[in-house]
């Protein structure tokens, strides 16, 4: 069994209000202790993320700088791929070949969106009113909550998070 996992809230790891056993569906064995995030923890995490989003350290970044951070994240995922694939195998019961493949795709998703981070632009929209203008602006959506199925957490999280940029 691995060490207990923790919540990450406001830049720090912490234990949840309680823990639960995560069972490997392929073996029926407990493979890890997972933290429960209850209403208080979720509210604190959302508040911390909202505050961080407004902080100049993030809000002041250009799209190109944000893209570079996504490239760095992709590199970190790739470096940790064997461990991440093992976690996914333990948690989902999938074979390691499949989870290894999915982790590689996760890194590629982040690289793809890193590459287009500074290339998305708004559009001027022609309309039939001479005294009006219409245009679109592409902006990050902000803090989100995403629920993904248990059987492909990292892969489906990458798909959801990256399309929101």
Regions found by a protein language model. Give the residues of each.
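Conserved small-residue-rich beta-alpha loop and adjacent elements
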Residues: 123-165
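Residue-level signature of catalytic and energy-coupling elements of molecular machines
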Residues: 11, 28, 66, 110, ...
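Short glycine/serine/threonine-biased micro-segments
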Residues: 9, 14, 91, 120, ...
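Gly/Ser/Thr-rich helix-start
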Residues: 12, 94, 116, 123, ...
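Glycine-rich loop-to-alpha-helix module at the N-terminal edge of alpha/beta enzyme cores
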Residues: 31-121
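Hydrophobic face of amphipathic alpha-helices that form TPR/SEL1-like repeat modules
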Residues: 1-27, 52
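A short local loop/turn or secondary-structure capping micro-motif enriched for an aromatic residue
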Residues: 23-24, 39-42, 154
């Amino acid at each position: 069994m691995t060490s207990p996992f923790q919540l990450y809230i406001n830049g720090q790891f912490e234990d949840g209000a309680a823990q639960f056993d995560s069972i490997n569906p392929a073996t029926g064995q407990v493979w890890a202790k997972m933290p429960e995030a209850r209403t208080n923890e979720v509210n604190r995490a959302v508040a911390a993320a909202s505050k961080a989003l407004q902080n100049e350290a993030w809000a002041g970044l250009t799209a190109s700088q944000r893209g570079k951070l996504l490239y760095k994240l992709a590199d970190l995922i790739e470096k940790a791929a064997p461990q991440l694939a093992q976690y996914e195998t333990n948690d989902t019961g999938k074979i390691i070949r499949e989870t290894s493949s999915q982790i590689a795709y996760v890194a590629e998703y982040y690289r793809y969106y890193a590459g287009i981070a500074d290339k998305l632009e708004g559009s001027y929209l022609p309309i039939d009113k001479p005294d009006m203008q219409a245009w679109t602006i592409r902006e990050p959506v902000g803090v989100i909550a995403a629920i993904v199925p248990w059987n492909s957490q990292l892969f489906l999280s990458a798909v959801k998070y990256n399309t929101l940029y």
